[in-house]
Amino acid sequence: MAATSDPISPPVLFYDGDCALCHGAVRRLLRWECLNGKRPAAQPKLRFAPLDGHTAEALRKQGELPGHREAVILWTDQETAEGEAAVSAALRAIGRPRLAGAFGRLPAPLRRAGYRLTARYRHRWFGRVPAGCPLPADPARVLP
């Protein structure tokens, strides 16, 4: 949220801001959305914010977001998706339905188990984001 009086407009993908895997995934989603259709997206379809940031905290205080910080969360005006469901919904939102469909074709128990395993060991396997490695400074896309 750029200023405290600005409303937070959905959809927003909340991610672990310290996780190198999550950070890289957000960079990739930003790039894929911009390259969708071989031209920059005229109207961005997805915004991003860290789970431990000001935007997430404001929504938690309003009861809009769960209190935990173990899974990526896609917050929209209709629903809140978590974990592997949020990943699939984010891919569809940026115009990558084939990739979302491929992900969705995995059996649900396997998809959930794979997500939980990766989420549990993400810092050990992929590391943490160095302090001097911010996402692009685009307040319309990347929220605090």
Regions found by a protein language model. Name each.
Residues 1, 39-40, 54:
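N-terminal cationic amphipathic segment used for targeting or macromolecule association
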Residues 51-144:
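Thiol/selenol-based redox catalytic cores and closely related redox-interacting motifs
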